[in-house]
Structures are given as structure tokens and as C-alpha cells.
Amino acid sequence: MTIWEAFFLGLIQGVTEFLPISSSGHLELAQYFLGFEKLQSYVLFNLICHLGTLGSILYMFLPQIKQSLITERNHIFHIILGTLPLFPLVLILKPIKATFDQPQYLGLCFLFSAALLFSGVYFRLQMQKKHSLRDCLTIGLFQAVAVLPGISRSGATISAARLLGWDKQDAIQFSFLLAIPAILGGTFLEIWQFLKLPASEIPPIEIGQFLTGFITSFMIGCASLWAVIQMMTQDKWVYFAWYCLFIGIATTLYFQM
């Protein structure tokens, strides 16, 4: 992997992790066309990029995180509750994920993302001030489904919150705070699986490329978070739905040819 390829993949991760268009789906496509999808070194590189975007959340939402830890600890309980469905559902969906990891199925997942985004824009319950424990669990279920590449985690969770009647600000904040344990847990699980590989299959660590991917995904991730907040508050969320619909159709047609 060259420095420029590392920059390009870090850019994709940073742009797509928080925009509701699926970072995993776009990385799958990019690595397919670059010929990287089967190489262990790029599995590890993806993990580094995910840690970069995790850093973006911690940086951009630091005031809210401090507030949750000091004065509004019920928020922490809501995050834990929303994370609970992730573990059993990931185990259930793991065999399905192995199938949907194939590029030819990405289009279907992008189309599912589009349907979620459209539903979050056009179909909502009456606005509610308080958020129930059931709401947190429901949003957590939507997050678990997003383990499939092509289904956006932020798109699924924000759309679920909007469907349940949450206002825009609460939906965005809960979605991205919910991402912290999800990304951490997923990253450590992947690292654990990676370390169990035979020594002969563990690739050399490319420090320059990994640093490039991490820094790029962090910086672009911060910009993407800002863009998501602006797009949501300005009622431009539906643009992402149309984008997922387009790329879903294009991907499906390409791999059926």
C-alpha cells in the first residue's frame, strides 16, 4: 500500500463513517476496485481508520461526554441499554454478514439504507420530549443490523430515533455517542481475531501508511460530523437517501453484468 492509497482509504472512511451512506460499504467497494479486499494487511488498516473516526467523535462530542459523566449519568445508562442488542444480534448476523461481505450483495444493503433514510424523513411519530428505555433498545436493534456492509450505522440509528419521534439534536447526539462503545467493541474484537492468526499470516506493520490513514480519517471525520449536523438541522437529510438509492442501483447493476 502506498501513502496515497492510505490517504485515499482514510479519506473514504472519514467521509462515509458519519455521513449516513455506510463507510463499510464504500470501503468494500474501494478495496474491491483497488484489489485489496482479501489481504490481511488491509483488514488491520481498516481497524486503524475506524480508530481515527472514533477519535473524531470523542473530540467533537467532548462537552456532551463530560456532561453525561458529571451531571446527566442517565445518558450513560441509555447508551449501555442501546448497546446491549449489538452483541447477540452480531452473533446471529455473523453467518449472514459473511454472505453480504461479497461485493455483489452490497447494492441490496445500500438500497436498504436508502429505505431507512426515506422512512426517517417522511414517516415519524409525534414529537416526544422524553425518551423511553424501549426507544433506546429499539435504536440499538437498528444499530446491530448495520453490521452488514452497505447499511449505514448512523443512518439506521438516526432514522430509528426520528421514526420514534425524537428531535433532530437528540437523534444525532444519541447516535454518535452510541457509536463509541460499538466502534470500540468491534475494533477490539477484530484485533483479537487478527492476533489469533498464525504468525506467518500477520503482515508487517506499515507505520507511515497506518499513520496517514489514522490522521486522515480523524480530520475528515471531524468535518463529516459537522456536515451531518448541518445537513440534519437544515432539513437536507433526504439527499443522503437519494444518494444511497443511486449507488445501490448502480452497484447492483454493475455486479449483475
Curated annotation (Swiss-Prot):
GO terms for biological process: cell wall organization; peptidoglycan biosynthetic process; regulation of cell shape; response to antibiotic. Its EC number is 3.6.1.27. GO terms for cellular component: plasma membrane. It is found in: Cell inner membrane. Catalyzes the dephosphorylation of undecaprenyl diphosphate (UPP). Confers resistance to bacitracin. HAMAP family: Undec_diphosphatase. This is Undecaprenyl-diphosphatase. It comes from Protochlamydia amoebophila (strain UWE25). The lineage of its organism: Bacteria, Pseudomonadati, Chlamydiota, Chlamydiia, Parachlamydiales. The gene is uppP.
